[in-house]
Each structure stands twice: as C-alpha cells, then as structure tokens.
C-alpha cells in the first residue's frame, strides 16, 4: 500500500517522494513534505507549491479511487485513503493470510550471512547473550519473510587460552571436590557451581586412568570435555528461546587454514615484525593503531582467529555479512574491516551491530545473580521466571544499540502496563467475538466494507500498515518498530472495542472483518518476533 502510493506519486511528480504518517490522524493517513524540497527549485513558498501539487495529484487519472481527500496543510500534502482502496487491500491481505506483509523473492533479494551469539563455550548463556540472540533470530525471520536468503551461524571459540583456562578450572575443582585436596586457585579462573558439576560429571564419565596422567594431559582432555558439555548446554538454552542455527563453525577447524590467509596478508604487505611480534597494519584503514596477530611466544591473538574466520565467510560470496557483537567489541570493527581490505574483499559488505548492556530488576531491585554461574544472570532462570515470549518481546522493544533496563514483574502483570499481555488480550477479544458471532468466517470475509466511519477506517489502515513496519524494521535494523507497531495496533483496537458494541450493530459483519484484519496483522507481527500469539487469555481489568 505504502509502496504503491509512493510509486504513483513519484510517477506523477517526476521526483523522489518521501511518505510519512501525519502526527495527527485527523490530517489523513499519509503525508509528504515534498513541497519544502521543491521550494528552492521553483522559488515559491512551500504552501503555494503544496496547494498546486495537491490539486494535481487529486485530479490525476492515476490516483482515481485512491483518495477521498488530497489537501495542502502548512506546506505538507495530506492524503486520506478511500474506503474502496482500503477494502481492495484488505481483501488481498486476508487472502494472503500468514504471508501478508511478506515479499516474494526478486532481483532485490539478498544473500545474507548472519553470525550472532557466538558466546565462548566456557559457561552457560547469560542475560547479556540473550539480547543479541533474540535480535539475530528475529532479524533472520524478517529477512526471510521479505524474500532474502539467510544463513545463521554460531562461531564456536573452541581453542585458545580461554578454553585452556576452562580445563584448568575444572581440574582444580576436581582436585578440591572429588579428591578432597587443598587447592590454591589462580587469580583468574572460571567460578560457579557449574564448574564443580562438570568436575563431578568428569569423574563419572571419563576413564579413571586419565587422572593418573601428567597434569597437562589431564587439562587438555578436561578442556575439550568441558567445552563440549557447555556447548550442549548453550544449545539447550537457545532451544528454550526457540532459536536454531543453520551452522556451528569451529574456530579450531577454521584456523587450520591460517597459513594460507597469512601468506595472502604477507603478499598484500599487510604485516610487519616488531618487538618479536607480528603486526597487522590496520591503522591504514582507520583503526586507532596497528594490531598484534602473533605474540612473542608465537601464539596467535584472538584477532588472528577472527581474520581467518572472516576470510572463510567472505569466500562464500554473500551479498551482505552481518555480525551481532556485544558493545564491548566496538574496537574490533575497524581491525577486522582492515584485514578484509588487505585480503582483497569489499569490507563495506560487513555490517556489525552492537548489543548494549541489559539490566534486570525484580521488585525494583537488581535481579538475583545465579549461584550456579557466579556473577551472571542465566537465560534459563529468566525464562523459568517470565517465559520465553515475554523475554523475547522485551529484548526487542528497544533499539539494540541502547541500554535496556526492565523489571521482570511488569511482564507478569495482566493489565495494560504489560505490553505483551495487552497485545495478547486484543487478539483474545477478537477471537471471543468471532466465537460469539452468529456469522461464519466465510460470511465475514465476503462482506463488502461500505459504512465505516473515520475511526474504523483508521483502525483498518493501521492493520494494513504491517508491510511497511516489516520493511522498516529490516532496513533500519530497528526491530523495536515491530514491537511498537503491535503495541499501537493493539491499543487502537482496544479503543475501538471499548467505544461501543460491535456484534449488536447493523454493520457487525463489516466490523468483524476489520477485527479479522487486526488479528492477522498482530499474529504475523508476533510470528516475526518469534512469539506465538494467544487466542485465549484471562483479564483482571
């Protein structure tokens, strides 16, 4: 609907047209500020240009049947859609059902490589990981809905110092809690009951002879053993959020190709030796300084592994590569992009989205940390507390790059202060009316819309605006727009529902048709957010 009108206006005016939603619904369904852009060109006031263009658009043969009104107002051109136009789109939307709001694959379709979560398999997933996980999963759902091809990958950091530290931590816990020895822990190690759990499980699972080997062998085996257990638990946590990856890439496997990548960097004159280290000339590509890839002891830095991994990704020739990282990884963006340029790739194809911090409250107090994980709030604990759907909604309700703070008790309330409940409640009200209605769904669908007032038309317009919300959410990586859309539509429906009777009116079938349209849009919006909308819900209002 939005796209059609924009295209027709651009054809008539032979200029790019921006379509907006008026702040005041009394001004119509759409507005354009094009007169302000043309004022300098024609050396006339925006008001005069708007009046001329409004007349031209309203009388043009290509817009016949589109609008009830096209008027100039303070330099803007405002459009009120006709009921015939709205009905045409309503009929098409209701026929499309779960595909309403989507697009078929076209020449504009992209091939997208989406990497997210990628938490080190050294501990359970905590609430900080969950935000990026939910965002990435919903972004993939929306991209696929819009006809794009998406591969979702989890990059498993299964080598290096952190994995060894995991093995050391489990070995020390084994000695203390299984062998009952006195242990001196290092300054840095993995804490939490989960480490003790792994140590005790290792005692039952692994051959007793292992623990008679030299300490380095024991640590190496325990590192792999603990890593595999943690990855299994991480996958279980993701399952609980209904998040599933197409691929899990092992850093250990990917890094086997490091020599070929470093040879190419060498040939590109991207490396140099200094202080017995190998450096990347990343400062040539807007990085703050050059970066070490190989340390004095000939071990590789974390960045070296990232470079090899991104080389493997870019060899697969996707249209776009999206990484979702924690905000603390901001400094890595320039250095990774620099390596891509040295390797001969177009680094602009890589987009890195940063997930900001999450602060959870309960009864206005900081949420209790997990004893099992040490100083973290586990995803599993919060899912058990408020449910998967509520958690997904709240994580998507704010821009990914802004800090998020919320009280989980809000998500347990059964009133309008709980946004996800109020959206479920709107859909529940619709289904209750449909059950009470003497009309079949087929009768309602075949009913022409002839007698709607301005408020009813606006509710229908809002329900039909889902495609624009979907498109904007993807193009701007602003998934909060989907949450805002669902909240606004639910709020408008509740206002409509509370304004008067629906079933006991001569135009009951017309109003129920609007309700079907609202339910369809809420259902499809929630599906893209990874939430199953409810058709039955209790209320304490």
From Swiss-Prot:
It is an enzyme of class 6 (ligase). GO terms for cellular component: cytoplasm. GO terms for biological process: arginyl-tRNA aminoacylation. It catalyses: tRNA(Arg) + L-arginine + ATP = L-arginyl-tRNA(Arg) + AMP + diphosphate. Keywords: Aminoacyl-tRNA synthetase, ATP-binding, Cytoplasm, Ligase, Nucleotide-binding, Protein biosynthesis. It is found in: Cytoplasm. It holds the Pfam family tRNA-synt_1d. It comes from the Bacteria. InterPro entries: aa-tRNA-synth_I_CS (IPR001412), Arg-tRNA-ligase (IPR001278), Arg-tRNA-synth_N (IPR005148), Arg-tRNA-synth_N_sf (IPR036695), ArgRS_core (IPR035684), DALR_anticod-bd (IPR008909), Rossmann-like_a/b/a_fold (IPR014729), tRNAsynth_Ia_anticodon-bd (IPR009080). SUPFAM superfamilies: Anticodon-binding domain of a subclass of class I aminoacyl-tRNA synthetases (SSF47323), Arginyl-tRNA synthetase (ArgRS), N-terminal 'additional' domain (SSF55190), Nucleotidylyl transferase (SSF52374). One of its GO terms (molecular function) is arginine-tRNA ligase activity. A motif ('HIGH' region) lies at residues 119-129. Its EC number is 6.1.1.19. Belongs to the class-I aminoacyl-tRNA synthetase family. Monomer. This is Arginine--tRNA ligase. It comes from Helicobacter pylori (strain J99 / ATCC 700824). The lineage of its organism: Bacteria, Pseudomonadati, Campylobacterota, Epsilonproteobacteria, Campylobacterales.
């Amino acid at each position: 609907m939005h796209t059609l009108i924009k295209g027709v206006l651009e054809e008539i005016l032979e200029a790019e047209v921006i379509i907006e939603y008026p702040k005041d619904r009394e001004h119509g369904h759409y507005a354009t500020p094009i007169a302000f852009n043309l004022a300098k060109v024609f050396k006339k006031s925006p008001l005069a240009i708007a009046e001329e263009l409004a007349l031209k658009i309203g009388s043009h043969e290509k817009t016949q049947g589109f609008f009830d009104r096209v008027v100039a107002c303070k330099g803007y051109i405002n459009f009120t859609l006709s009921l015939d136009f709205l009905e045409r789109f309503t009929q098409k939307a209701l026929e499309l059902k779960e595909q309403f709001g989507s697009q078929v694959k076209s020449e504009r379709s992209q091939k997208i490589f989406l990497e997210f979560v990628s938490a080190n398999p050294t501990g359970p997933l905590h609430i900080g990981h969950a935000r990026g996980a939910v965002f990435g999963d919903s972004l993939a759902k929306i991209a696929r809905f819009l006809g794009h091809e998406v591969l979702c990958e989890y990059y498993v950091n299964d080598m290096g110092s952190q994995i060894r530290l995991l093995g050391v931590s489990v070995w020390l816990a084994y000695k203390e809690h299984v062998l009952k020895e006195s242990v001196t822990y290092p300054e840095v190690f993995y804490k939490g009951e989960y480490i003790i759990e792994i140590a005790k499980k290792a005692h039952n699972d692994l051959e007793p002879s292992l623990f008679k080997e030299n300490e380095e062998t024991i640590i190496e085996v325990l590192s792999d053993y603990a890593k595999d257990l943690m990855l299994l638990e991480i996958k279980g946590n993701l399952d609980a959020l209904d998040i599933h990856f197409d691929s899990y890439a092992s850093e250990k496997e990917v890094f086997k190709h490091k020599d070929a990548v470093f040879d190419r960097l060498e040939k590109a004159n991207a490396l140099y030796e200094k202080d017995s280290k190998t450096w990347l000339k990343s400062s040539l590509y807007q990085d703050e300084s050059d970066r070490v890839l190989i340390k004095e002891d000939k071990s590789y830095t974390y960045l070296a592994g990232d470079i090899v991994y991104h080389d493997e990704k870019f060899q697969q020739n996707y249209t776009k590569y999206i990484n979702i990282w924690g905000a603390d990884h901001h400094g890595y963006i320039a250095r990774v992009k620099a390596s891509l340029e040295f390797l001969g790739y177009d680094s602009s194809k890589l987009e890195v989205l940063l997930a900001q911090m999450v602060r959870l409250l309960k009864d206005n107090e900081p949420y209790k940390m997990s004893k099992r994980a040490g100083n973290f709030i586990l995803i599993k604990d919060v899912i058990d507390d408020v449910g998967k759907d509520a958690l997904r909604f709240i994580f998507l309700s704010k821009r990914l790059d802004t800090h998020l703070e919320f009280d989980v008790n809000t998500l347990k309330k059964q009133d309008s202060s709980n946004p996800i409940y109020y959206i479920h409640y709107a859909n529940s009200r619709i289904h209750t009316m449909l059950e009470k209605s003497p009309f079949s769904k087929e009768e309602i669908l075949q009913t022409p819309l002839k007698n709607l007032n301005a408020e009813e038309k606006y509710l229908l317009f809002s329900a039909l605006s889902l495609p624009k919300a979907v498109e904007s959410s993807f193009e701007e990586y602003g998934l909060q727009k989907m949450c805002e859309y669902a909240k606004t539509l639910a709020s408008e429906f509740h206002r409509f529902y509370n304004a008067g009777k629906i079933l006991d009116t001569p135009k009951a079938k017309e109003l129920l048709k609007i309700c079907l349209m609202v339910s369809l849009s809420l259902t499809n919006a929630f599906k893209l957010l990874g939430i199953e909308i409810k058709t039955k819900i209790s209320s304490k209002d």
